Each structure stands twice: as structure tokens, then as C-alpha cells.
Amino acid sequence: MKSRLTALPDWDPALLQQLGLPIKRVEADSRRVLPGDVFLACRGEYADGRDFIPAALEKGAAAVLWDEADGFAWKAEWQAPNLAVPNLRERAGIVAAHVLGLPSRDLTVVGITGTNGKTSISHWLAQAFSLLGQKAALIGTVGNGFYGHLTETTHTTPDPVTVQQKLAEYRRQGAHVVTMEVSSHGLDQFRVNGVEFATAVFTNLTRDHLDYHGSMEAYGESKKKLFFWEGLKHAVINADDAFGRQLAAGIDPKQTRVVTYGLEQGDVRPLALAATLEGLQLTVATPWGTVDVRTGLVGRFNAANLLACLATLCVNGVSLQDAAAVMARIQPARGRMQSVGGAHEPLVVIDYAHTPDALEKALATLSEIRPAGGRLFCVFGCGGDRDPGKRPMMGAIAEKHADVAVLTSDNPRSEDPQAIIRDVLAGMDAARAHVEADREAAIHWAVAQARVGDVVLVAGKGHEEYQDIAGVKRPFSDFRVAEEALTAWGKRP
């Protein structure tokens, strides 16, 4: 079934003319309204934008589009032009896109979705296109902006108006390409409606966000929407993933070109693969020929992400040789298999792995490439107010793959950290785990126990610069704490 989420047939941009004033900017957050804006009062997941119409008008909104539902009526004291729009939340991105001149139409937009790998692939593609002379920006978990000049963000995929504003800003600043992480929440909540995607990339589907979606089936259906997007030219899909194979088989090749990739199968696959602490060496078969790729990126699962990038570059007109050459220059995204130490001290690896699949892949990778005789430590926890079903699963994975499992807090949010730890311990032999709820102390303990040749994986938070405890985000960086722990390690008698 073709999802026509970018150009709803019953939305007519000419309707905005009924407001009787020039429209240069729209805003869906009353706190960000500027004088002269048109305020989009949408019903949201946790709040109703119609409740903030008075606040938007006080800030100078010139007109209001409001969600026509639930018997809501415009109040006479709100003396401003207004227009009732059914399902405004679904149309907000489309309205913003038309007001801003359809910015994605002038860009090559690559959307990346899947449980794991979105951030790495989006960053690597932005780097690669930029190094190839095509100015590239990105929108995602670690930040928004041009590579090397990112601003922090609170959501993987921003709200629909912000998405369009960012695309318009990047177009104005000369971008040719935008790589965008597209979360299941973003698709389910219509945040990318109005975006014209050239290429969609699917990484994998493993357990995550079941607290929101309720089932893996619903989670998969959300991801699937991106690959039946109106006007999509290319779909790059992981054929090692069962859902990916099903997805690829359901796409009409007359509408969208499908290129699969994978470590075991796919149109783009390795004929040879060597993984070490120094990086990856691959000989890759592709529809465009065979090529050797050398990179400093670490880990077999990163080899799969690299193949996704190689395929995406090639379907967008980059020659195979140029694509392979530029991948050799790629640097890892912050908090994604990011290492510190090594050589004459333990190696500490910071990674965002916060799902069972991601944790298992990170541990398996490091177990494979660690020095002979070296031990593998795993410092990890599970987030509060999120799917509790994955907690014992992650405990079992840490016990299976790590020589020393160090159980600590992640972002407990409103939950009791000790209760989360008990949930994790239910999946493992508690006697084999070192428990330290204080994350900083846990990292210091693991590094202090480690020797030269040992590897310490600090998993779960990656790039994050905070820890959310009891609803308060306190400054915290796994990377900074790891550096401090290594400094202390070096000062030992």
C-alpha cells in the first residue's frame, strides 16, 4: 500500500489565502512564536496546542490554524484571522513546507530508519558527501546542522515545523544533501510529513520502544511507512534482517529502486572481511563492481553500516571507487564505538548501545578484536520509564559476552535505580555482577580493575551530556568520566 504522507490529496495550499495576509513563517510551539507568525494549534501526544492559542496571540501571532475536532470552537475574544483544519497535526509539516517553498524539493534528502545504526550512517553519509564536494547537513540524535558544527537536539526527529525550518535553513546556506535520522516516533507522529525523500535506508528491526508501540508488529509498521513514500527514488535495505527482506520484497521496483546490503547476503556484501582494533578491511561485491575498502571504523556491525553508506552513495550518483575512497576517511560519530586509552593502558569504548541487539553486537565485536588474553568489561544499565521487558535480556547478554559485568544506572528518570537494577539482575547470575548504582563510580571501578590489554565497554548513553535522575538532567559525560578514570589509572603506584 502506497503511503501518501508527503502530499495529502485533500490539502490545498491555496486555503491559506483565506487568512487574508502574507505568510512568511509558521510555528507550532507557542513559546517560539514571533510577531507576524501563523500559529498551528495542533492536538499533540501530551498537550493540546489549542490550549495555547491565547499565549501565541499575546506573542504576536498574526493568524491561527487550529485543529477542527472534539467540538472545539474559536472564541470571539481571539480577534485574529483563523482557519479550522481537520487533522492539523498530520498536515502541519505540509503546511510549513508550502509556506517555506518546499525546501526538500531542492535537496537530496536521505532518511535513515531502523533500531540501531541510524546515527552512525547519517553522520558518515554527511561526512562522505561533504568530502566529495557536496555540502551536507544532518538532522538526528547527536545534533542538527552541518557536519562539525552541530547544535544539540532533544529528539532524534524534531517536530514537523522544525524539520521544515531546518531544511529551509540548510537550503539557504547552500546544502546539497541532508541526511536525516527518521525515528519510528517521528513517522508515527507525522514529523516528516512534507519532506520529499530521495533515498530511504533501513538498518534493522530489533526490540526497542515497545513501551510506546506496544508490539514489534506495530513498531515495524511505523518504520515501513518511509519505504512507501510518495516520490521515493531509492530504498537501501539490510537483507540480513528478516523484516528487511520482507520490506524489500514488498516494494514495487517500478516506483522505487531497491538495493539490499548485508554481511551475509544482499546486492552489496563482503567477499572478505577482517576486523581488528585498528579498523576494518573489506572486499565488497556490488552491482557496480567489486572494490576494496579500508577504514578505521571498528566492529563487524559497523561493517554493515559501512555497506549501507556505500550503497547509498552509489545510488545517488557517486562512483564506486570514489565511494570506497571516501569511506576510508570517515570518523566515528560521537558516542558510537568511540575509544579512549589503549596502547599502554586499558582501552575504554563509549557506545550508545541501549537495546539487547545493540549491546550484544558491541560486546561480540569487542570480544572478537580484543588483544589475546585481554578481558572484556561491560559497564551498563537500563533506562527508566522505558520498556522493562528488555532489562533481563540485557543482563543475560552482558553475562554471556563480558568477562566482568558492571551493572549501574543509565537514565533512571522517574524510576528507582535499584528497582531497575533488580529487573536486570533477574536475567543473570547476580553473584557474577558487580553492582554500583552510581554511574561515575561504576566507570571508575571498572577502569581501576582493568589491565593493559583489557577492554572496557561503557554502554547505553554514548554522546549524551547528561544523566536524567528523578526528572532532573544533571551534567554527565561517559567519555569525560572515562578520561578521568584513565588518568587515575595512570597515577596508580
Curated annotation (Swiss-Prot):
It is an enzyme of class 6 (ligase). A motif (Meso-diaminopimelate recognition motif) lies at residues 410-413. Meso-2,6-diaminopimelate binds at residues 386, 410-413, 460, 464. Its EC number is 6.3.2.13. One of its GO terms (molecular function) is magnesium ion binding. ATP binds at residues 114-120. The modification N6-carboxylysine is found at residue 223. NCBIfam families: murE (TIGR01085), PRK00139.1-2 (NF001124), PRK00139.1-4 (NF001126). PANTHER family: MUR LIGASE FAMILY MEMBER (PTHR23135), UDP-N-ACETYLMURAMOYL-L-ALANYL-D-GLUTAMATE--2,6-DIAMINOPIMELATE LIGASE MURE HOMOLOG, CHLOROPLASTIC (PTHR23135:SF4). Catalyzes the addition of meso-diaminopimelic acid to the nucleotide precursor UDP-N-acetylmuramoyl-L-alanyl-D-glutamate (UMAG) in the biosynthesis of bacterial cell-wall peptidoglycan. This is UDP-N-acetylmuramoyl-L-alanyl-D-glutamate--2,6-diaminopimelate ligase. It comes from Chromobacterium violaceum (strain ATCC 12472 / DSM 30191 / JCM 1249 / CCUG 213 / NBRC 12614 / NCIMB 9131 / NCTC 9757 / MK).
